[in-house]
From Swiss-Prot:
<feature type="binding site">
    <location>
        <position position="124"/>
    </location>
    <ligand>
        <name>Mg(2+)</name>
    </ligand>
</feature>
<keyword id="KW-0479">Metal-binding</keyword>
<keyword id="KW-0378">Hydrolase</keyword>
<comment type="function">
    <text>Endonuclease that resolves Holliday junction intermediates in genetic recombination. Cleaves mobile four-strand junctions by introducing symmetrical nicks in paired strands. Promotes annealing of linear ssDNA with homologous dsDNA. Required for DNA repair, homologous recombination and chromosome segregation.</text>
</comment>
<dbReference type="GO" id="GO:0007059">
    <property type="term" value="P:chromosome segregation"/>
</dbReference>
<keyword id="KW-0540">Nuclease</keyword>
<feature type="binding site">
    <location>
        <position position="90"/>
    </location>
    <ligand>
        <name>Mg(2+)</name>
    </ligand>
</feature>
<dbReference type="InterPro" id="IPR004612">
    <property type="entry name" value="Resolv_RecU"/>
</dbReference>
<keyword id="KW-0233">DNA recombination</keyword>
<keyword id="KW-0227">DNA damage</keyword>
<keyword id="KW-0963">Cytoplasm</keyword>
<keyword id="KW-0460">Magnesium</keyword>
<protein>
    <recommendedName>
        <fullName>Holliday junction resolvase RecU</fullName>
        <ecNumber>3.1.21.10</ecNumber>
    </recommendedName>
</protein>
<comment type="similarity">
    <text>Belongs to the RecU family.</text>
</comment>
<dbReference type="GO" id="GO:0005737">
    <property type="term" value="C:cytoplasm"/>
</dbReference>
<dbReference type="GO" id="GO:0004519">
    <property type="term" value="F:endonuclease activity"/>
</dbReference>
<dbReference type="InterPro" id="IPR011335">
    <property type="entry name" value="Restrct_endonuc-II-like"/>
</dbReference>
Length: 205
């Protein structure tokens, strides 16, 4: 079947095994475990870990597909032979953690000093605002790939920056540090982002 896939990385189903040691080799082992993995790969592996250990139920939302051509090799069967992915209308992930509905997107940048707002679409901002209006928890996981740092950035802060900058320019790295929550380094899962969500929850209570 000919499917036109959007730019991105494939989901990995296995994670590299590491032998942890103390001292300077610890960080090297953590880095090796994430080598070649994109942000979505790390989130998907973390979600699998959370589900298997009964910590949370969080899934990646399916991307809407537009079907272009269908063949019917048999009266009782239909085969999609050509389709393409449409632009996602909301965010990447949603689920339940500690009795709360959470909804979030995942973004990466190579920039070291700021995060471009052009990486978001207005409908995503509107969606996160709607989540907040229903007492849900919304945020974005932002990864600075050049710094190997990831942050939970609250939807409230993102919406405020979007309105202030009118969806243009960038959010300063220092602003993300000030209002966000650093995801700590971890071995399994490699991106234990719920640790940062826990800190976020503490400030919400």
């Amino acid at each position: 079947m000919a499917i036109n896939y959007p730019a991105g990385t494939r989901r990995r189903t296995a994670q590299a095994k590491n032998t942890m040691r103390t001292g300077k080799t610890t960080k090297k082992a953590l880095t090796f475990g994430k080598r070649g993995m994109g942000l979505e790969d790390e989130i998907n592996l973390a979600n699998d870990y959370y589900l298997a250990n009964h910590l949370a139920v969080i899934h990646k939302k399916p991307t809407p597909i537009t079907i272009v051509k269908v063949d019917y090799p048999a009266r009782s069967a239909a085969k999609i032979t050509e389709a393409y992915f449409k632009q996602a209308s909301t965010t990447d992930y949603n689920g339940v953690y500690q009795g709360r509905y959470i909804d979030f997107d995942a973004k990466e940048t190579k920039n070291k000093t700021s995060f471009p707002l052009k990486n978001f679409h207005e409908h995503q901002i509107v969606h996160l605002a709607n989540v907040l209006s229903q007492n849900g928890v919304g945020f974005v996981i932002i990864k600075f790939t050049s710094l190997d740092e990831s942050y939970i950035y609250p939807a409230q802060a993102l919406i405020r920056q979007w309105e202030k900058l009118r969806g243009k320019q960038s959010i300063a790295y220092q602003d993300i540090i000030a209002e966000g929550y650093r995801v700590p380094e971890s071995l399994n899962p490699s991106l234990d982002y719920l640790k940062a969500v826990d800190q976020y929850f503490e400030n919400l209570n």
